[in-house]
Amino acid sequence: MFSIFNIWGTFNKVLFFLSLTVSLAGLVGNALLLWHLGLHIKKGPFNTYLLHLAAADFLFLSCQVGFSIATIVSGHEDTLYFPVTFLWFAVGLWLLAAFSVDCCLAYMFPSFCSPNRRPRFTSVVLCLVIWALTMPAVLLPANACGLLKNGMSLLVCLKYHWTSVTWLAVLSGMACGASKFLLIFGNCCSSQPPPKFCKLAQCSGILLFFCRLPLVVYWCLRPVLKFLLPFFFPLATLLACIDSSAKPLLYYMKGRQLRKDPLQVALNRALGEESQSGLGGLSLPMHQV
């Protein structure tokens, strides 16, 4: 019996320090990404989403590192750890859903949704609205269910919780659905290869499915999973840290053409919109017509 607890304790510590290590590496990557996206790359409707997504990932990883260090020093986990980190995680999820859907619409309806035909600050306004709406969407259920303070009302908690579960399910479905649409129709039903931002949406959707969804599931089923699968939360946290840390590397690999390409050149090639080609809508290849 004691050996089982020892194995679980060791496994938990390994996941904890892996999450801390990945978060530290991701902080450096997202800081560089924010620097280049914020100061050295011309803004457009698509890379505006990625700039805000990098900011959300940076805040998520910063909270991970801060609360992890506090846990090491104090010897116990702060009660605010989960709601605060999940707040920035949810902002990133919402931004990723908006980015994927926008890429999908621009690919399907280039005549109406292309960057040149939309109001200039549409993406900026939408990102600011997402930041503003996510805070009450996460903090109100957390407060009602006793994550921010002691004491809770079961009926009020259930009402807020199922509301948050609904919008999280919708966001996850939008992001995954849009990325899968781009993956399938962009490769099978178009005579042209998908534009670079559509490819980034495809890769981000795959990362979301494998690395972000577990933490969403934990938020939705926290009491059950905490009792039945106590290892689920640290594992989901590690996967979420991997997702937030992998995006800068993904952008760099997508933009790199030569082995010795500098970071700024690769990121500008991957995220700059001045060289973005037309999104060209869906059409069947000639040999299928």
Curated annotation (Swiss-Prot):
Keywords: Cell membrane, G-protein coupled receptor, Membrane, Receptor, Transducer, Transmembrane, Transmembrane helix. GO terms for cellular component: plasma membrane. Coiled coil: none annotated. It comes from the Eukaryota. GO terms for molecular function: G protein-coupled receptor activity. The chain crosses the membrane at residues 14-34, 53-73, 79-99, 121-141, 165-185, 200-220, 223-243. Belongs to the G-protein coupled receptor 1 family. Mas subfamily. PANTHER family: MAS-RELATED G-PROTEIN COUPLED RECEPTOR (PTHR11334), MAS-RELATED G-PROTEIN COUPLED RECEPTOR MEMBER G (PTHR11334:SF32). This is Mas-related G-protein coupled receptor member G. It comes from Mus musculus (Mouse).
